[in-house]
C-alpha cells in the first residue's frame, strides 16, 4: 500500500487550476490574499501557480513563497511540465519558501501521447526519470502526475509510476483530467495501483479530478477508501470547464461521515480524531473571499457554501428545525463559520476597529488600500444603519483588485423613467490624470453607462454576462454586480458593490476593462499546451 500519513492531506489548487476558469484571472495582490486565507484554513499544500507560464505567474508564486507558510504552515508548490526550463523556473519561484514542492507531470494516455505530445511510450519512459531526478536536484519534495491517468493503459501507467518513485518522487498524483471516470472505477484504479506498483509504499497516492460528469467529489471519496491520502481540490470547485473537486464538499463529507471513513484509516468508527487538518470554521470565509476576488458567483444551492445551503422553505422542515435542528440539518452552520452576527461598527468606528475586523475576515490590506476601504466604509455607514460582515467583504474586495488601474471612475449620472430615453453621463480619469466625459443613450441605464464607458476607453470587447444580487436583506442593502467581458477569446471579470446598482455596474465594468488592459499583450502558457509547439515559438 501507498504511504499513509494517518490522515487526508489537502492540496489546494485554487490559485493554479482554479484560476484557469474562464474569467477568473487574479492579480498578484489577489493571489496573495487567497494564499494567506488558505494558510488560515489549514490546507497542507498550496499550489501557487505555474511559474514558467509568464513573468506575472512567476512573480506571484515567488511572492507567496516569501510571505505565506513558514515551518508550521503549508507547503508552497509550483507546477511544471516535464522539461528542464519549466522545472528550473519552478524551483527558482518557490525557493524562498521554508517548505516547498515541485509538481511535474507528463501525459500517459495514448490519446495524449499521439495527438498532444506526439511521443511514444518509450520516449515517456525515458523522460520521467530524467525530469523527476532533475526536480529532485532542487528540492526534497517532488510530486509527479500522470496526466489523463484515468484513460491510460494500466500496465503502462504502473511502469511510469514505478519509474517516477524510483527516481525520487514523494507523491504520485492520479488525475482524472477530463472528468470521465466513475466512482467505482476510480476506486478500483487506486486499489490496482496499490497492488501492482512494487515500490508504491515509498510514496503518497494523490488524486486530482474534474467535474465534467458531476462525479469529482464522489470519485475522490471512493479513492480515499482505497488508499488515496492526498486530495487536489479548489475552493468553490472552480476550475476549467465544469470545475474541480470542491474542497469544502470533500472536507465536510469527511467531517460529517467520519465514523464511516475511520475504519479505512485503521481507526475505530467512534474515533474523534479529524481526518484532515482543515479548520472548518474558515470554510465560509474562504469561499466568499475567492468568490469576491474572482468574480465567480457561488450558485445559491451549492453544497456547504451556497446561500440556500442552510435555508428551509418547507413549513414541515421549518417546524422540525425549530424543535431540533438535527431533524433536517446534518451540519451545524457554525461549523463552517456561518453566523448571523452583525458587527457593531458604525459612523463613529475608527480605522483600527475596521482593520481588525477585516483581518478576521481574511483581508490583510496595506495602508493605502485600508484608507480607501475605510473611506468606503464611512460612506456606507452614512447610508446604511447596520453594517454586516457581508457588507464589509463587498466594499473591500475591490481594494485588492487592480491597484494600478488605467481607468478610474469619477462620476456617473443617469436619467431614465417610463417616458424617458435612458441617458448616462460618465466621467473617467485616464492614466495620465486627464478627465474625459461622455454622454450616451441606451436601452436602459446600465446599457447607457456601458456605451458611455466604451466611447471613453476605446477598448473593444463583448459584454457576455451581467448579474446583480443583494448582499444582505433590506431596502438599503448593497447591490453586488458581476460583469464579464470577452476579447480575443479571453474572459475578464469585474466586480463591485454599492447601494446604487447603476454605480456598482459602472465600477464593475471599469474593473473588467482594467483587467483586460492589464492582460493585453501579456503572454501566458497553459500548462497542458503541447511543449514542443511552445518551444518552437520560443516562449
From Swiss-Prot:
Top-rank EC class of the record's enzyme: transferase
Catalysed reactions listed for this entry: 3-methyl-2-oxobutanoate + acetyl-CoA + H2O = (2S)-2-isopropylmalate + CoA + H(+)
Name of the protein: 2-isopropylmalate synthase
GO terms for biological process, alphabetical: L-leucine biosynthetic process
Keywords associated with the record: Amino-acid biosynthesis, Branched-chain amino acid biosynthesis, Cytoplasm, Leucine biosynthesis, Manganese, Metal-binding, Transferase
SUPFAM superfamilies, A to Z: 2-isopropylmalate synthase LeuA, allosteric (dimerisation) domain, Aldolase
EC number: 2.3.3.13
Main location: cytoplasm
Amino-acid positions noted as binding Mn(2+) in the UniProt annotation, renumbered to this chain: 17, 208, 210, 244
PANTHER family: 2-ISOPROPYLMALATE SYNTHASE 1, CHLOROPLASTIC-RELATED, HOMOCITRATE SYNTHASE-RELATED
Domain of life where this protein originates: Bacteria
Region annotated Regulatory domain, chain positions: 408-539
Intracellular or extracellular location(s): Cytoplasm
Xref: CDD domains: DRE_TIM_IPMS
Amino acid at each position: 500500500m501507498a504511504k499513509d500519513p494517518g490522515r487526508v492531506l489537502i492540496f489546494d489548487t485554487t490559485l493554479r487550476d482554479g484560476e484557469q476558469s474562464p474569467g477568473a484571472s487574479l492579480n498578484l495582490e489577489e493571489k496573495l490574499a487567497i494564499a494567506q486565507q488558505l494558510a488560515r484554513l489549514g490546507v497542507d499544500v498550496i499550489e501557487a501557480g505555474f511559474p514558467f507560464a509568464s513573468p506575472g505567474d512567476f512573480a506571484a508564486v515567488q511572492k507567496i513563497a516569501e510571505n505565506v507558510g513558514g515551518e508550521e504552515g503549508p507547503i508552497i508548490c509550483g507546477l511544471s511540465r516535464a522539461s528542464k526550463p519549466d522545472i528550473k523556473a519552478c524551483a527558482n519561484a518557490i525557493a524562498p519558501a521554508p517548505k516547498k514542492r515541485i509538481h511535474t507531470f507528463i501525459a500517459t494516455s495514448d490519446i495524449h501521447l499521439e495527438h498532444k505530445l506526439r511521443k511514444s511510450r518509450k520516449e515517456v519512459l525515458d523522460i520521467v526519470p530524467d525530469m523527476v531526478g532533475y526536480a529532485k536536484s532542487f528540492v526534497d519534495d517532488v510530486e509527479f502526475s500522470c496526466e489523463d491517468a484515468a484513460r491510460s493503459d494500466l500496465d503502462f501507467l504502473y511502469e511510469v509510476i514505478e519509474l517516477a518513485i524510483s527516481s525520487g518522487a514523494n507523491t504520485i498524483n492520479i488525475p482524472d483530467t477530463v472528468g470521465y471516470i466513475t466512482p467505482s472505477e476510480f476506486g478500483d484504479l487506486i486499489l490496482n495501483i496499490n497492488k501492482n506498483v512494487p515500490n508504491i509504499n515509498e510514496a503518497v497516492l494523490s488524486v486530482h479530478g474534474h467535474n465534467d460528469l458531476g462525479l469529482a467529489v464522489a470519485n475522490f471519496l471512493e479513492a480515499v477508501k482505497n488508499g488515496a491520502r492526498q486530495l487536489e481540490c479548489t475552493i468553490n470547485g472552480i476550475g476549467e470547464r465544469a470545475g474541480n473537486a470542491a474542497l469544502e464538499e470533500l472536507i465536510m463529507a469527511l467531517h460529517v461521515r467520519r465514523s464511516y471513513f475511520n475504519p479505512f484509516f485503521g481507526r475505530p468508527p467512534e474515533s474523534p480524531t479529524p481526518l484532515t487538518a482543515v479548520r472548518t470554521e474558515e470554510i465560509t470565509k474562504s469561499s466568499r473571499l475567492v468568490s469576491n476576488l474572482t468574480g465567480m458567483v457561488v450558485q445559491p444551492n451549492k453544497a456547504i457554501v451556497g446561500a440556500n445551503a442552510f435555508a428551509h422553505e418547507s413549513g414541515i422542515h421549518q417546524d422540525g428545525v425549530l424543535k431540533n435542528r438535527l431533524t433536517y440539518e446534518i451540519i451545524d452552520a457554525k461549523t463552517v463559520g456561518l453566523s448571523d452576527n452583525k458587527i457593531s461598527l458604525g459612523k463613529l468606528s475608527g480605522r483600527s476597529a475596521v482593520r481588525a475586523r477585516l483581518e478576521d475576515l481574511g483581508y490583510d490590506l496595506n495602508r493605502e488600500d485600508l484608507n480607501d476601504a475605510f473611506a468606503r466604509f464611512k460612506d456606507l455607514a452614512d447610508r446604511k444603519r447596520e453594517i454586516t460582515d457581508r457588507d464589509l467583504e463587498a466594499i473591500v474586495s475591490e481594494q485588492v483588485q487592480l491597484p494600478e488601474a488605467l481607468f478610474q471612475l469619477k462620476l456617473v449620472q443617469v436619467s431614465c423613467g417610463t417616458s424617458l430615453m435612458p441617458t448616462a453621463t460618465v466621467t473617467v480619469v485616464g492614466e495620465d490624470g486627464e478627465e474625459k466625459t461622455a454622454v450616451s443613450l441606451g436601452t436602459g441605464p446600465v446599457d447607457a453607462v456601458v456605451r458611455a464607458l466604451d466611447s471613453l476607453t476605446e477598448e473593444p470587447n463583448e459584454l457576455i454576462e451581467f448579474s446583480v444580487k443583494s448582499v444582505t436583506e433590506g431596502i438599503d442593502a448593497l447591490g453586488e454586480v458581476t460583469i464579464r467581458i470577452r476579447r480575443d477569446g479571453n474572459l475578464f471579470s469585474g466586480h463591485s458593490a454599492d447601494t446604487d446598482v447603476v454605480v456598482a455596474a459602472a465600477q464593475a465594468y471599469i474593473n473588467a476593462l482594467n483587467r483586460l488592459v492589464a492582460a493585453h499583450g501579456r503572454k501566458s502558457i497553459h500548462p497542458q499546451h503541447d511543449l514542443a509547439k511552445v518551444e518552437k515559438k520560443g516562449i
